[in-house]
Every structure is written in structure tokens, then in C-alpha cells.
Amino acid sequence: MATTSPCAAPSPSLRCPLALSHPFASPPPPPALRLAGPKLLPGRLAVSPPPGIPAVASALESLILDLDDDEEDEDEETEFGLFQGEAWAAADEREAVRSPELVVPELEELPEQWRRSRIAWLCKELPAYKHSTFTRILNAQRKWITQDDATYVAVHCLRIRNNDAAFRVYSWMVRQHWFRFNFALATRVADCLGRDGKVEKCREVFEAMVKQGRVPAESTFHILIVAYLSVPKGRCLEEACTIYNQMIQMGGYKPRLSLHNSLFRALVSKTGGTAKYNLKQAEFVYHNVVTTNLDVHKDVYAGLIWLHSYQDVIDRERIIALRKEMKQAGFDEGIDVLVSVMRAFSKEGNVAETEATWHNILQSGSDLPVQAYVCRMEAYARTGEPMKSLDMFKEMKDKNIPPNVASYHKIIEIMTKALEVDIVEQLMNEFIESDMKHLMPAFLDLMYMYMDLDMHEKLELTFLKCIARCRPNRILYTIYLESLVKVGNIEKAEEVFGEMHNNGMIGTNTKSCNIMLRGYLSAEDYQKAEKVYDMMSKKKYDVQADSLEKLQSGLLLNKKVIKPKTVSMKLDQEQREILIGLLLGGTRMESYAQRGVHIVHFQFQEDSNAHSVLRVHIHERFFEWLSSASRSFDDGSKIPYQFSTIPHQHFSFFVDQFFLKGQPVLPKLIHRWLTPRVLAYWFMFGGSKLPSGDIVLKLSGGNSEGVERIVNSLHTQSLTSKVKRKGRFFWIGFQGSNAESFWRIIEPHVLNNFASLVTQEGSSIGSDGTQDTDTDSDDDMQMSDTERDE
């Protein structure tokens, strides 16, 4: 029998009055919901939030360590990004957002003694049990329990801050025939889950309110947004923006200043190249702050100008307007603003404005930032004066300002475009000797210059230097491949092309295939050229018109005619196995408007190097299945982290097997499909290799029976595993010799050098940050250790 602490006993008084003016709520029957109530009394049910949102642990830490779920971090919201150290997103304002009052009858008010006793017993025993036993106990009460009784139990769980137990009770309630939607209870459950960092469960209750035709309370919007923003590494920023927009557009609420500022801070917390896509949302936040007559923080102006400076097309008028508004508000332009202005002007090649802003930086008496010199170099380069850019670089070093990676990248880019070979080689040697990282962009610029100058021997030497120091990529190999074709070394080009095709970390694309096709045509090897053409047709790559004409002419000489081939859209065996592995790791599928047609949504973590590599590989492997918008990226670095396939009936089998009513499940025959390639892609997408050598796999969806089939299937391959359940996900772990055996099985199908990437990111598991946020709960943890058979 499970035991509980004395504090688990139910309180005789379970009232939780909090008031919120809610214009969209229809008058409900008392006493279930009271829109105007007294202040919260200490002796009553206190389910108000703790001072801050608990730090949401990573999925891996939740699996390996026994974390304290009650640990809180009051400074969680003031330690990130542009606004570090600012207290204008404080928790006390979060506390001020109030939710509807929930009133529950006192236990002694219930007429039957036996009912009071049973409810008291449930309140005492239920919180100690895990999911399976928890549900069985509730099912055993169906003959007598009512909605009011279950509401009392749920609210008691909230009082003792066992929010997972409260969510289980509430989820069980909504499945009963007697359930009637209770807006106040749903709001309270969602708010408590959000404060506890359980964003998925909070979002589930939130969406249930919307489906009931109710607008969630302001507190629910506010708490859910803050919970999303608290997810590590900003993985749920997009979801936070979605809820924020709904809060204003659907709810008609006016968020507090702290919420505006917290969201804006998250939008500008990433690097410029990534954050520039957040400009539209940042402008929307700024618009809402201004139109609600709230004070605009200085860093909001600075952040907006910073975002505008990274845009491909500079909105000069908007930057001028923001600077004017900033001055009218009484704020001085700091160094960060001046550097952003220089960056914007330099992209336009406006030397006069760039130098004028530079003069303002000099007058400020502050330390001269390296980025300001980079902007000056950019401005002079755009006006056709690359040697002045070089003078800027030398001036920076003369003033004992150490160059950084960005400055080396910029000056090498400028000098390679100017075809200054000796200067570029000298700069490149300095860069390499500095032991700085991120050499790849400089190597690529150098190789492009050698290509333009037909210096193919130096290009090959640069290629060899690069692969010795950097992780190879498709662009690097494509440049080298084109160089080999230009000099007529088709045999070597064929070898390089084969390496690209066989190495999943590199892969081929439209450009590399066209280069190889031109190479075979120049060598008049029409048989091999036809094979490349067939491969391109299958992958739906665009064939250059002149190459197609030469191929047709060459084959005509051999009395062979190329006819347009109708490519049958069918997943090959490798693609099917890859897709199964990704689905086990959490890839989503959805139905299209047309019946029997489905779409696969590939989504990867932007903050994961391992997922970045896997993203390029999956994009290349499923290229023919992707939508036209997703296929338009030839440069691997520009491939989005989210892309989808075309709707096709061929995916129906996988939807039927892996999804039930939109929720992920495990197929009954999954134990037969666990081939080495399936396991490898499951590991690469939703797994991790710990520094100790242990391997962990995250399993999305399914129940204990399905997981047991997987464990037993692995056991037949002499792989003993342990399974833990955390929240809604199962974690399958291999330790010691079992991890070594598992690695030997999957290693032939794992991308080259992928293990080192996934080991470094041991705490980043899965495809979606939101999936990791509920794993720190005290949810049931089922041990399915196959050693029990021994």
C-alpha cells in the first residue's frame, strides 16, 4: 500500500476565490463559478503560483537524475538575451493577473457520511500512485462518484501542489458520461500546470477550453506564454508568439508590460542571422505596447533597430523613425544602437552615413567595438574600394583591438572578391594560426576565388586543408567536384561524386548532379550520363537544358532515344525504414483535406548541430516527396528546420499504424520493423549517446504493452534495456555492454561523425522542445527491465 505524508489529507475548506473581469464568460450557475469574490484568505485553498516558474529540466536530466520538482528559480526570466539584468518582467506582475473564482463545497457540507469518507480516502491515496494504478482506482469509483466529488479531489491535488495528479483526475473526469464543462476548474488546472512548467498539459487544457467555445481567462494566456518562454534555449518561442497573438486577437486582452517585454526579449535573444526572421512579431509587440499607452523600454528601441539592421533589404525610413521616437522618449543612443545603424548603412554602401555614425562612437569615449570596423569594411567594399577595407582591418589591429571571427570572415570575403590572392592567403594563414573556430566560410571564399582564377591545384590543396580542420559539407564538395570537371579529371570527379552520394552527412543535390552530368557528357560517356539522368528524374531534380540536349544527341548516335519517363511515386525500402525511425522519435503526420491523403511534417531543433546535419540529409533523401516551396533550397545552410512533404496517399499506411485520432501510438507489429536502419534513425532523431557511453532513446506515443513489445524485440537481439516513463514519453536506455552492442548494430547506418555531435548534445533529445518540457514531472516511472527474465 502506498503511503502519503500527513499534508496529503484533504482540507475541510476547499474554496479558492480569485476574481477576474471576464467579458466573454456567460453567467454560470452558482456556486461553481463566481466572477466577483473576496480576497484570497490564508486559511482557504491556496493554489496561487509560487514566486517563479520552476526551472524546466532537460529530458535527459529528468531521465538520469532524480530531480526535485519543487525547485524554483525566481530569476528564470531575467537572465537572457538583450535585457540581461533588467527587472521589468518581474514575477510580481505575473501574480497580479487573476483567474476566475472556483468555489468547491466543504467536505462536511456533503450529506452522506460514506461519501465524505470515500472522498477523503481518495484525496489521501491517489496522489501517491502512478498513472496505471491511479486510473484503475478512479474507474472503481464510477458507480458512486459525481462531478462535484471528482472536482473536490482535483482541487485538493492542486492545493497540495500535485498538479500532475490534478491533471489526471481532470482528464479522467472529461471522459465520463456525466461530465459538464467547468470553465473555472479548467482555468485553475491550466494555470497551475503552466506555473509548474508543464506546457504540453497546460496547452491541452487550453485547447479544450477553445473547443468548448470559451475564451480562456487572461491568466491562462499569460501563464502559458511565460511557461513557453521558460523552456530552455527558446525552443518554444513560436508557440509563445502564437498564444500571445491569440491573447490579443481572440481574447481581446491587453497584456501587461512585463509580458510584452519578456516576449520581445526572447525574440532578440538569438544571433542576428536567426533573429532577423522575428522582425514582424517584434514590430507587433512594439505596436501593442505603444497602442496601450505603456512605457517603451530603451532596449525595445535598440532591439528593433538591431533586427532591422540584419534584414536583407534595409527599411531606412523605419530605422530613422525608430531613432526619432527613441530620442523623443528621452533615451540616448548607446553603442549597440550606433553599431546597428552602421550595419544598416554599410549594407547600402552609404559610406558618408557609416562614417558619421562611426564619428559618434568615437565621441562617446567608449571602447571601439570590432563590429563597427566590420561595418566600415563592408561599406567601403560595396563602393568598390576593397583596399580601404583592408586599411580598416589593419587600423583595428594597430589599435590593439584583437580581430574576431566575424572580422576575419568579412575581410577574407572582400579580398577574395577583389581577387587579391597574396593578401587573401596571408589573411587565411593568420586566421588558421589564431586557433579560432568557424573556418569553413573563409575556406569556401578562398576556393571560389581559385575557381574564378582557374587555379585548380591550389583549390585542391585548400579542399584537403579544409576537410582536415572542418566538418565537410555539400557546398565544399560541390566546389571541388566542379573544379575536377573543369580540368577534365572525370575519374576523380566520379570518385568524389560517389563519396557525396554515399555519405549521408554530405549528400548530392541538383547542382552536384548537373555538374557530374556535364562531366560525363564532356567525356562522351553517355551510358553513365544516362544513369545520372535517371537518378535526377527519380529525385525530380531539374536538368539543365543544354545538358539534356547533349545527352539526347549523344544517345541518338547510338540509336537510342530519351523519352520522358513517368516516375512512379513510391517510397523505397530505405525511405520507409527512415520514416519509421523518425516517427518513433516524434515526427508528425496529418491528414490533408482530401480523404486518404496525408502529409509528413519534418521538424528539427535549431539549437542542435546533430539535428542540423540530419535536417540536410533528410531533405536530400526525401527531396522528390517535398513540396515545391521546400525543394527550392539548393544551399544546405538555407534549408529550413521545418519542411513538409506533398500530400500523398502513400503515407496513409504510416498514419494508420502510428496515429489514432491524431495522437501517436505504437503499431502492433512494431517489434517486427526494428531493423538496424530504423534503430539508427530513431537514435539520430530522438536519441543521445552519453559521455559514459550509455545510449538513450526517446519514444513518442504508445503504451506499456507497445513498449514491452519493443523491449522484447530488442531482447531477442541480445540487447537488455531499461525503460522509464516520464510524463507522456518513454525512455529506453542501454548501459555498458548493451550500449556497445546497440552501437555496433546501428553504426553502419549512422551518419559519419554523427556520434560526436549527439554526444555533445546529450541534453537535447527529440524533435520538439515542447515535448521535453513535461518530462520533469513526478509522473509514473515504469521499469521494464528485461533482466527480470533472468
Swiss-Prot record:
GO biological process, one term: Group II intron splicing
Mutant lacking the gene: phenotype: Chlorophyll deficiency and seedling lethality when grown under normal light or low light.
One CC-aspect GO term: chloroplast
Keywords from the UniProt entry: Chloroplast, mRNA processing, mRNA splicing, Plastid, Repeat, Transit peptide
PPR repeats: 182-216, 217-254, 256-296, 299-333, 334-368, 369-403, 404-438, 439-469, 473-507, 509-543
Magnesium found in the keyword field: no
UniProt entry tagged with the keyword Repeat: yes
Subcellular location(s) of the protein: Plastid, Chloroplast
Transit peptide location: 1-56
Chief location of this protein within or outside the cell: plastid
Domain of life (superkingdom): Eukaryota
GO molecular function, one term: endonuclease activity
Compositional bias ranges of the Acidic residues kind: 771-790
UniProt family annotation: Belongs to the PPR family. P subfamily.
Function text: Promotes the splicing of group II introns in chloroplasts. Required for the splicing of intron 2 of plastid ycf3 transcripts, a factor required for the assembly of photosystem I (PSI). Involved in the splicing of atpF, ndhA, petB and rps16 chloroplastic transcripts. Required for the assembly of PSI.
NCBIfam families in alphabetical order: PPR (TIGR00756)
Protein name according to UniProt: Pentatricopeptide repeat-containing protein OTP51, chloroplastic
Lineage per the UniProt record: Eukaryota, Viridiplantae, Streptophyta, Embryophyta, Tracheophyta
Gene: OTP51
